[in-house]
C-alpha cells in the first residue's frame, strides 16, 4: 500500500466542532465526538441556571473538563470546587462528583479515554 492509500485508509487530523458554538445549546450534551474509530470520548455539556448533574461515581477513567461559559460548583467527596470559564479540572477514576450550574448556567468540555462499548455477538452453538 502506498503512502496516499495508507493515509486515505485512516482517520486524519481535522476540525470536528466548535466549542463556542456548541456551548450555545440549552441543556444536555451540546456536542460530542462522532468518528467511530477513536480512542477518546469528548462532549460539551450544557446545564441551565440552577440545574445539576446529581451526585454519582465517575467511570474507571480519568476525565478532564474545561469550563467554557457560565459558572458553577463541582462537589466531590471532600470539597466544593468553584467552576469558572477557563478552569481545567481533573477528575480521577471513580471519583464522586456533582455538578451544579450557577446563575448564568454552566457549559463545559469533557474528554476521557473512550469507554468500552457494548457489542452484540452471535451466540455460538
Name every feature range the model reports, one short phrase each:
Residues 2-6, 10, 98-125:
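Double-stranded beta-helix
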Residues 49, 60, 79, 95-96, ...:
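A generic "binding-loop/recognition-motif" signal
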Residues 36-38, 75-79, 102:
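Short strand-coil-strand connectors
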Residues 1-40, 54-55, 121-125:
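A short, N-terminal "cap"/entry segment at the start of jelly-roll beta-barrel domains
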Residues 53-55, 74-75, 91, 97-103:
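Short beta-strand His + acidic residue motifs that chelate non-heme Fe in jelly-roll/DSBH
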Amino acid at each position: 500500500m502506498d503512502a496516499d492509500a495508507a493515509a486515505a485508509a485512516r482517520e486524519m487530523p481535522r476540525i470536528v466542532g466548535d466549542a463556542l458554538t456548541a456551548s450555545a445549546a440549552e441543556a444536555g450534551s451540546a456536542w460530542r465526538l462522532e468518528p467511530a474509530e477513536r480512542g477518546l470520548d469528548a462532549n460539551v455539556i450544557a446545564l441551565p441556571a440552577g440545574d445539576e448533574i446529581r451526585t454519582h461515581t465517575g467511570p474507571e477513567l480519568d476525565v478532564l473538563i474545561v469550563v467554557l461559559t457560565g459558572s458553577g460548583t463541582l462537589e466531590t467527596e471532600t470539597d466544593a470546587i468553584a467552576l469558572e470559564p477557563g478552569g481545567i479540572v481533573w477528575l480521577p477514576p471513580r471519583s464522586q462528583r456533582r455538578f451544579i450550574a450557577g446563575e448564568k448556567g454552566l457549559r463545559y468540555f469533557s474528554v476521557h479515554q473512550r469507554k468500552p462499548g457494548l457489542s452484540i455477538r452471535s451466540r455460538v452453538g
